[in-house]
Design a protein with these regions (language model features):
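Phosphate/ribose-recognition catalytic cores of enzymes acting on nucleotide-derived substrates
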Residues: 238-354
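N-terminal catalytic cores of NTP/NDP-binding nucleotidyl/phosphoryl-transfer enzymes
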Residues: 51-109, 114
């Protein structure tokens, strides 16, 4: 009886894994980023350190905005070092982003990834532990000495620390690699600094990727990210002007006000919602042909081969290419003619870039 029960449980687990694999395999690449965690073991997420425990923790620290290829180089080293000492990989990151606390008046923070997106990308990387530490005004006042002694050593019991080429931490970012080497000797943990990851002789950084996105250079941005840039939002009601010219659009309100929005223009995108994916053309801008308010930015997408009301739906926009700048046309008919050309160009792009 016990053997029969064991066989049934084993068959059910195996069937579930096969289902997950088939499901993920059937999705386009950009959707697999948010589905692959079905087949990965889930990361253990910690929002405080009171009950944190890991075997021989191998740790890295940072904001990891974008979880781009430079970050993934660090995460890969994290896995290797954890394996070498029979340890577990740990990423220590922050919420909110430190700049929102130490420089709240700047108001120009633009993130490549929301916290939810970042968690999913970390899960995709297969790490063991993710610490999302509350970045408070009090925490920001910790000196680098206090942070190492109280947090890295006193609470996490770090055995190996992996840092990037430009890593600095602590109050006013005064802690650097030379200081960490002294701490490693004092507190008996190992440390390694990784070289910068280059692409086309330029270093990969979150700043470089943000600049590329603002300029509409998604070839550079997506290459550096290692995946297609995504924007999540909710479909809200608009003025329904698109229907009058046979190009109905879904108006999007971004899910996170700190998420970077590409510059004004027309883009080739894929649209994901309700486990479906569509091609589409997206306009970001002030809609100067039909709107006199130049300060109002709208995000609206015309979804190809789709015409249903989806108000309130959560939607994912995946960016492939910037087609052109936003323009003001002399009439709605001229706008309609240009949109028809845009659609033809985008369909051609997707046909030639499968």
């Amino acid at each position: 009886m016990k053997i029969r029960k064991y066989l049934i449980v084993t068959i059910c687990r195996f069937s579930f894994l096969i289902f997950c694999w088939l499901f993920v395999s059937s999705l386009p690449y950009e959707m697999t980023i948010f589905a692959q965690n079905l087949t990965h073991r889930l990361v253990k997420i910690h929002t405080d350190l009171n009950s944190f425990h890991a075997q021989n923790p191998v740790l890295t620290i940072g904001t990891f905005d974008g979880v781009h290829l430079g970050h993934r180089k660090i995460i890969s080293a994290l896995h290797d070092r954890a394996k070498s000492i029979n340890g577990e990989s740990v990423i220590f990151t922050f919420d909110p982003h430190p700049r929102k606390v130490v420089a709240p008046d700047e108001g120009n923070l633009r993130l490549l990834t929301t916290l939810d997106e970042k968690i999913t990308l970390f899960e995709q990387c297969g790490i063991d532990h993710l610490i999302i530490y509350p970045f408070t005004p009090e925490f920001s006042q910790l000196t680098y000495e206090e942070f190492v002694e109280k947090v890295l050593v006193g609470q996490i019991h770090t055995k190996f620390l992996v840092v990037g080429y430009d890593h600095k931490f602590g109050k006013n970012r005064q802690g650097d690699f030379e200081f960490l080497k002294k701490c490693a000797a004092r507190f008996d943990f190992q440390i390694e600094k990784l070289d910068v990851l280059l692409m086309n002789e330029a270093n990969i950084s979150s700043t470089k990727i943000r600049e590329a996105i603002q300029q509409g250079d998604f070839k550079t941005a997506n290459d550096c990210l290692g995946y297609k840039f995504m924007l999540h939002g909710t479909v809200v009601e608009g003025q329904k002007l698109g229907r009058k010219i046979q190009f109905p659009t879904a108006n999007i309100e971004a899910s996170d006000p700190d998420k970077i929005i590409p510059g004004y223009g027309v883009y080739a995108v894929r649209v994901n919602f309700q486990n479906q994916t569509f091609q589409g053309m997206l306009n970001i801008g002030s809609r100067p042909t039909v709107n006199n308010n130049a300060d109002h930015r709208s995000i609206e997408v015309h979804i190809f081969d789709f015409d249903s009301d989806i108000y309130g739906e959560q939607i994912e926009l995946v960016f492939f290419q910037k087609l052109r700048e936003e323009q003001k046309f002399p009439s709605l008919e001229a706008l309609k003619d240009q949109l028809a050309k845009d659609k033809t160009n985008i369909l051609s792009y997707f046909k030639n870039n499968k």
